[in-house]
Amino acid sequence: MDYTVEEKEAFMREALKEAEIALENDEIPIGCVIVKDGEIIGRGHNAREELQQAVMHAEIMAIENANASEESWRLLDCTLFVTIEPCVMCSGAIGLARIPKVVYGAKNQKFGAAGSLYDILTDERLNHRVEVETGILEDECAGIMQDFFRNRRKK
């Protein structure tokens, strides 16, 4: 499903709410929502410190929630909105879940796997390719990360 700019911004604001939850828990503030037919079916935020699990990234949590909601591992006809460009692990999970579209706010120059450092989501050698859109609420998404790391360096 294609969404208007206003709808995309609204869903990204929901992802930013998830990032705020991560921030409150002293986690790297990344948030994610998965949308199907205009409804959020999965939410997630970074929870590695809280759960002491290296793989608990926002996208993984949102995919698990959406899988439970849909009672299926296939998330066809869904769009994943995430505040920061997915990493290699999350890009792999997105492909394995058969999510057809990812919208992310800000680039991840150090770990990005959706065009910045690597380009896993659109790699033609893989059996599932994902449409990628960037820049929705980019300043807000980048800002929460920049503030987090600026404050962390002061500690």
Language model features with spans:
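Short beta-strand scaffold segments in enzyme catalytic cores
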Residues: I30-G38
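Immediate flanking context of iron-sulfur cluster ligation sites
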Residues: S72-I84
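Short beta->alpha transition motifs characteristic of CBS
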Residues: I41-R48
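Short loop/turn microsegments at loop-to-beta-strand junctions
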Residues: I28-I30, C78
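Zinc-dependent deaminase
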Residues: M1-N25, W73, P86-K155
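A short, polar/charged loop-to-alpha-helix boundary motif
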Residues: E50-I60
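Small-residue (primarily alanine) positions within well-ordered alpha-helices
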Residues: A15, A19-A22, C32, G42, ...
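A cytosolic small-molecule/anion-sensing beta-strand core signal
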Residues: K36-D37, E64, L76
